[in-house]
UniProtKB/Swiss-Prot annotation:
This is G protein alpha q subunit. Mg(2+) binds at S47, T180. Gene3D superfamilies: GI Alpha 1, domain 2-like, P-loop containing nucleotide triphosphate hydrolases. The lineage of its organism: Eukaryota, Metazoa, Ecdysozoa, Arthropoda, Hexapoda. Residues 35-48 are annotated as: G1 motif. It comes from Drosophila melanogaster.
Length: 353
């Protein structure tokens, strides 16, 4: 009988060891997929960052994929010009030549979301308007209304885009703007580990959908548009965009769901800040700024400190990087550093080292 029990005990022990081993294996396999949640207010660059991951770590964009963006580029051009035409009226700016108001009426007669081609008379109207002194003044005052960052990029390159055989470049695709509604996921494999990036809509109306994404988040990547220090919200005419972004970051970093997730700050659109800081002074929007004017390095550090001050836990590290999401080389370098941070934290958290 004792012999029998001993054999049973041995078998039970062996089974327990197998179960333990399998549990360890399952835990390890579960961690072979790392979930990265991209957060930030609308137009901070989250979708552009995911496109970069597809270019750098995925299959990129085939000619067929690129053809799928032609309509979107055309729509972005119409949308940008229509935004400026509306602003001309709001800001009471006159056209350089009076008859150009008729061209403006022509461009406004089209619903930009239905645009599928780019030809005369609309092509000529948009080219003529972009050269108009009044529209240029309106463009210079773009912080006073809503205009996409890519407006100048496309409108300055119409000679290429108007060609019959036009095929969008990767840069055209990176710059193409379509507001994210709902949740987009992009998984990619890196060194045998699946990085699952989740991009959620940034506009206020989209944020209630985030709750479904909160489970098992390895890292939060929070994007800040540095260039928004002097801009107002898309959803509200009197709120500073950066203040809204900062309030959101403060909420995110204190959520109980994310206590074990590493936090990475991407201070994005540094190229736009460097351009803008020369004529739009930080102190006019943040009176507590006491650094030099027209100094982009001082401005970047000031904004970084503002965000880091939102973290109530001195023990919790926030990793930060200054980025230009439309610059593939910059994102390649930054994500290389970020990958190491994410991996180290995941190993530490789940004792897989």
């Amino acid at each position: 009988m004792e012999c029998c029990l001993s054999e049973e005990a041995k078998e039970q022990k062996r089974i327990n060891q197998e179960i333990e081993k399998q549990l360890r294996r399952d835990k390890r396999d579960a961690r072979r997929e790392l979930k990265l949640l991209l957060l930030g207010t609308g137009e901070s660059g989250k979708s552009t960052f995911i496109k970069q991951m597809r270019i750098i770590h995925g299959s990129g964009y085939s000619d067929e994929d690129k053809r799928g963006y032609i309509k979107l580029v055309f729509q972005n051009i119409f949308m940008a010009m229509q935004s400026m035409i509306k602003a001309m009226d709001m800001l009471k700016i006159s056209y350089g030549q009076g008859e150009h108001s008729e061209l403006a009426d022509l461009v406004m007669s089209i619903d930009y979301e239905t645009v599928t081609t780019f030809e005369d008379p609309y092509l000529n109207a948009i080219k003529t308007l972009w050269d108009d002194a009044g529209i240029q003044e309106c463009y210079d005052r773009r912080r006073e209304y809503q205009l996409t960052d890519s407006a100048k990029y496309y409108l300055s390159d119409l000679a290429r885009i108007e060609q019959a055989d036009y095929l969008p470049t990767e840069q055209d695709i990176l710059r193409a703007r379509v507001p994210t509604t709902g949740i987009l996921e992009y998984p990619f494999d890196l060194d045998g580990i699946v990085f699952r990036m989740v991009d959620v809509g940034g506009q206020r109306s989209e944020r209630r959908k985030w709750i479904h994404c909160f489970e098992n988040v390895t890292s939060i990547i929070f994007l800040v548009a540095l260039s928004e220090y002097d801009q107002i919200l898309f959803e509200s005419d009197n709120e500073n965009r950066m203040e809204e972004s900062k309030a959101l970051f403060r909420t995110i970093i204190t959520y109980p769901w994310f206590q074990n997730s590493s936090v990475i700050l991407f201070l994005n659109k540094k190229d736009l800040l460097e351009e803008k800081i020369m004529y739009s002074h930080l102190v006019d929007y943040f009176p507590e700024y006491d650094g030099p004017k027209q100094d982009h390095a001082a401005a970047k550090q000031f904004v970084l400190k503002k965000y880091l001050a939102c973290n109530p836990d001195p023990e919790r590290q926030c990793y930060s990087h200054f980025t230009t999401a439309t610059d593939t080389e910059n994102i390649k370098l930054v994500f290389c550093a970020v990958k190491d941070t994410i991996m180290q934290n995941a190993l530490k958290e789940f004792n897989l080292g």
